[in-house]
Amino acid sequence: MSRIGKKPVQVPAGITATVDGQKVTAKGPKGELFFVANDEISLKLENNAVVVTPVNQTKDARSKWGMSRTMIEGIFKGVKDGFERKLEINGVGYRAAMQGKNLQLALGFSHDVIYEPPVGISIVVPKPTEIVVSGINKQQVGQVAAEIREYRGPEPYKGKGVKYADERIVRKEGKKK
């Protein structure tokens, strides 16, 4: 069984972290984030590191132990460097453009798809076939990228659609005569 929770989370330079009961708050150059741990997890700030321990040894507490540590590590990385997810668009006539702060996607429908990003997420279109989603909250960045990909996911025959930049599409062979 993994024991990733045993390792304390080091507070990176340039970030101030505070622990108040079950709440960890991190302030950094990119902004401020917090994480509220479950009641079965105890948090302490010792030697510029957050120590995560389960209150008791129940299966439920142990299962939330490693997840809590990873979430705290994620908020530290978010306020220091931020997160980004790159998307690629493949297909004839498929393209993206910014329309104010909204993302306009031409994906082969009879209409253009307009996506309004939530607060705290920035979307950049360096090329008409590339989209970069960035922000400080890892979950929110991944969710926005998944919502954009969902409009026209990649299909296995020609590879047309919106895919993650690091995603490999398993291609299928067409029908034979």
From Swiss-Prot:
Protein name, per record: Large ribosomal subunit protein uL6
InterPro entries: Ribosomal_uL6-like, Ribosomal_uL6-like_a/b-dom_sf, Ribosomal_uL6_a/b-dom, Ribosomal_uL6_bac-type, Ribosomal_uL6_CS
SUPFAM superfamilies referenced in this protein's UniProt entry, alphabetically: Ribosomal protein L6
Function: This protein binds to the 23S rRNA, and is important in its secondary structure. It is located near the subunit interface in the base of the L7/L12 stalk, and near the tRNA binding site of the peptidyltransferase center.
GO biological process: cytoplasmic translation
Any single Pfam family the record assigns to this protein: Ribosomal_L6
Record family assignment: Belongs to the universal ribosomal protein uL6 family.
Cellular component GO terms, alphabetical: cytosolic large ribosomal subunit
Keywords from the UniProt entry: Ribonucleoprotein, Ribosomal protein, RNA-binding, rRNA-binding
Single Gene Ontology MF annotation: rRNA binding
HAMAP family according to UniProt: Ribosomal_uL6_B
PANTHER family, sorted: 60S/50S RIBOSOMAL PROTEIN L6/L9 (PTHR11655), LARGE RIBOSOMAL SUBUNIT PROTEIN UL6M (PTHR11655:SF14)
Presence of the UniProt keyword Ribonucleoprotein in the record: yes
Organism: Rhizobium johnstonii (strain DSM 114642 / LMG 32736 / 3841)
Known partners and oligomeric status: Part of the 50S ribosomal subunit.
Keyword RNA-binding included in the entry's annotation: yes
NCBIfam families: L6_bact (TIGR03654)
